[in-house]
Amino acid sequence: MDLLERLGLGGRRVLILHHDDLGLTHAQNGAYQALGLPTGSVMVPGAWASGVKGEDLGVHLVLTSEWPAPRMRPLTEGESLRDEAGYFPESLEALWRKARAEEVERELKAQIQAAAKLFSPTHLDAHQGAVLRPDLAEVYLRLAEAYRLVPLVPESLEGLGVPPPFLPELERLLYETPFPQVRFLDPYGLPPEERLGFYLDLAHLPPGLYYLVHHSALPTPEGRALPDWPTREADYFALSHPEVRRVLAEFHPLTWRAVREALF
């Protein structure tokens, strides 16, 4: 029996609406509180991780730090996870070229354990999909099982930028995992002016389990220190729009906490 059948939601349109990058800035945290949508994940190495309070929070596992500021450092001493200045690598390519799986495992454990001191985590996901190198994906799924947290597992790898050499092993892991798989939706790459239309078009989706990630941030000087601030503000304004709220109300809302209770 699949997850939706187990939850009595078979044949329904079900949506996990997920707020990424919490803990990164006050603007990100403020948008989470202002929108009143419960599900999101926290970047534990972020400066403002301790300021996030909510009912359905996960760990947004960090292995890269791509912005000029703020930069983030590992919680552990793994040399393969640091650049010359001691920060996480700036790109997935740099991470995947250098990272040792045993050091990644220690770092992810440290982030999960630190998160548990701040809130009661329900789920795991990874910033920039950093665990899509197959050996790191195995670590990610193993830690999810060990800590009884639900991992984000996409139904398809299409459009996620996975290097072709990684695909066969990742597809095997997807096939074998006991965790539920979701239809992954992420408007991050769309121009900000197209964001509202993207959310309104959700009205046309067929039944299924959807995971929609957004990066909403308040319009503040601090939030605008990030180079991608227009896309973050576009998410915030779109999700505040009454017509978008009407479209979202047509879905059955689901939290990772409810999924976790069903699985564990």
From Swiss-Prot:
<feature type="binding site">
    <location>
        <position position="127"/>
    </location>
    <ligand>
        <name>Mg(2+)</name>
    </ligand>
</feature>
<keyword id="KW-0614">Plasmid</keyword>
<dbReference type="Pfam" id="PF04794">
    <property type="entry name" value="YdjC"/>
</dbReference>
<dbReference type="InterPro" id="IPR011330">
    <property type="entry name" value="Glyco_hydro/deAcase_b/a-brl"/>
</dbReference>
<keyword id="KW-0460">Magnesium</keyword>
<feature type="binding site">
    <location>
        <position position="21"/>
    </location>
    <ligand>
        <name>Mg(2+)</name>
    </ligand>
</feature>
<dbReference type="InterPro" id="IPR006879">
    <property type="entry name" value="YdjC-like"/>
</dbReference>
<comment type="similarity">
    <text>Belongs to the YdjC deacetylase family.</text>
</comment>
<feature type="active site" description="Proton acceptor">
    <location>
        <position position="20"/>
    </location>
</feature>
<keyword id="KW-0479">Metal-binding</keyword>
<keyword id="KW-0119">Carbohydrate metabolism</keyword>
<comment type="function">
    <text>Probably catalyzes the deacetylation of acetylated carbohydrates an important step in the degradation of oligosaccharides.</text>
</comment>
<comment type="subunit">
    <text>Homodimer.</text>
</comment>
<dbReference type="GO" id="GO:0016787">
    <property type="term" value="F:hydrolase activity"/>
</dbReference>
<dbReference type="GO" id="GO:0000287">
    <property type="term" value="F:magnesium ion binding"/>
</dbReference>
<keyword id="KW-0378">Hydrolase</keyword>
<protein>
    <recommendedName>
        <fullName>Carbohydrate deacetylase</fullName>
        <ecNumber>3.5.1.-</ecNumber>
    </recommendedName>
</protein>
<feature type="active site" description="Proton donor">
    <location>
        <position position="215"/>
    </location>
</feature>
<feature type="binding site">
    <location>
        <position position="60"/>
    </location>
    <ligand>
        <name>Mg(2+)</name>
    </ligand>
</feature>
<dbReference type="GO" id="GO:0005975">
    <property type="term" value="P:carbohydrate metabolic process"/>
</dbReference>
